[in-house]
Amino acid sequence: MKRTLELLQNGGTGFLPESKPHGWVRLMFENWNSLGIGTQSWKLDRLNYLITHLRIDIIAGCESQCNWTMVDTNSQFLALLAPGKATKGVAAHNKTERIQKDQAGGTAIVGIGRICDNISCMGEDHTGLGRWSWLRLGKGTTSTRIISAYLPHKPGHNSRGCTVWEQQSRYFEAKGDLRYPSTIFTEHLLDLISTCIAHGEHILLAIDANQDVYSGRLAQRLREPPFNITCMLEDATGETVPNSHFSGSRKISTIFGSKGIV
């Protein structure tokens, strides 16, 4: 996170807008690569700084890397986020296993401040694996489902069984499904999105997909009917999505959205 701020402030990809037009909703998404609950408080300090400085309304993220059942009440995500402001949301993790406190994976999405009054419901991945979390803004004929998700990638040969991929493999293999966790993830997520669209909801999907956000399998499926969902960052910034890590060469994280939201 520190490196990202340095790049942005020194002319890197994108910009840090300090003002927000009236009536706009600002959504922030990041792969935290561990929030460092109990070990790296600077990450939450910096996150809270950005929330205030950029007037963030909804924070979404993945790889929180915390089993929230193993930390006390004062260390829960909503208790640490945006002190003094109203918050409403979900921090999800794999509840099907009790591995360790700094458990790989996890997703979260939280509304901050006045936007909380517009959150009609919220939830998480029905399997209990924490693959995604979501909230819905509005209700009736005008509502938007905002999903924060993490699509796992296959680990190397030296992994020790604790990766997100391996956690999900164990869960589905126990149910007789031997497909790749990434394949199952895509199927389940598209089922959820299809149901939301059928109920008239708009979609925002903030995701670390671990595959190209233009040519990857998920991106290709999202462009097709009935989804018609595309990457929104290009429309918002006029530029293609940058590499998702300052030292990387892959575009794997973005925010997809229904047409007409921006």
Identify the residue ranges that each predicted region occupies.
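Active-site regions of metal-assisted phosphoester/phosphodiester hydrolases
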Residues: M1-D45, G113-P226, V262
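Metal-dependent phosphoesterases centered on the DNase I-like endonuclease/exonuclease/phosphatase
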Residues: R46-T96, T163-I261
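Short, basic and Ser/Thr-rich N-terminal targeting/leader segments
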Residues: G23, L54, Q103-A104, R250
